[in-house]
Amino acid sequence: MRFFFLLLPVLLASMVSFAQENPYFVTYDHHMEEPGNLDLEVSATTDVPRAGQKYYFAPWMEFEYGVTARWTTELYIEGQTTYGDSTVFTGWRLENRFRPMKREHWINPVLYLEYENLNEASRIQKEIVGGGSDVTSPNSELRNTSAHELETKLILSSDFHDWNVAENFIVEKNLSKGEGFEFGYAAGFYHQLATLASGEKCRLCRENFLAGVEFYGGLGSTLNFSGRNTGNYVAPVVSWLVSDNATLRFSPGFGLTHESSPVLFRFGYSYEIQGIGSSLSQLFGRKR
């Protein structure tokens, strides 16, 4: 774990590119990472707890790489700290997104497959399936319960002028237990606040901001397919291109059910390194 934090400044200083992340935290659209580019992101989820619950802070790191124009792979490393309890490492995830069609269409499908090696203390809530995360049990109990899970998503996404609309249907299977399937959803829209550049070098100008809203939550399981008794949220989202290669994102998510936290706060910082794949290929090619 310490290796990644030591390596991060070196990677950030090596190369730059122009990129702006979409503002979603849970919903996926059809835009893939550029081939050969590496996107590094540090994000976190925290909440306003209900009575009897404890405040937590759940950070994670993402390493997203564009393998081809239609295939993006991503590694997540996560943990969490619960106030008055402890700090724990909660596991890792490896996701792959595949875009079947090369050209833009009215609706653009993306196939998503993720393997998760987590424990039950995970609270980043990158998605919500079933009834949602356990935020009441102590970490000492949750960290000893491992879960090897396989998650799939059908992503449908469309661009209309400067607007994006996306819908995700989520299915997750716990491979460690003889459980059924759990379901969830995410959907959202966003747009660029201005499509014409101001003509000035300005980071606070409207063209550097994307804003929208996303909706996400659980849909129960094969035992009880329902949106009731699950966590559900509506969340304004915004991203700000703070430099040619870095983006800040923020989102307050408001709980719609008693099983939801009253508010989930999410924030993230991403930095894209252009052409790292070809640079590494040339480096190792010269050593042969």
Where are these regions (language model features)?
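Bacterial N-terminal signal peptides
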Residues: 5-14
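Transmembrane beta-barrel domains of Gram-negative outer membranes and organellar outer membranes
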Residues: 19-288
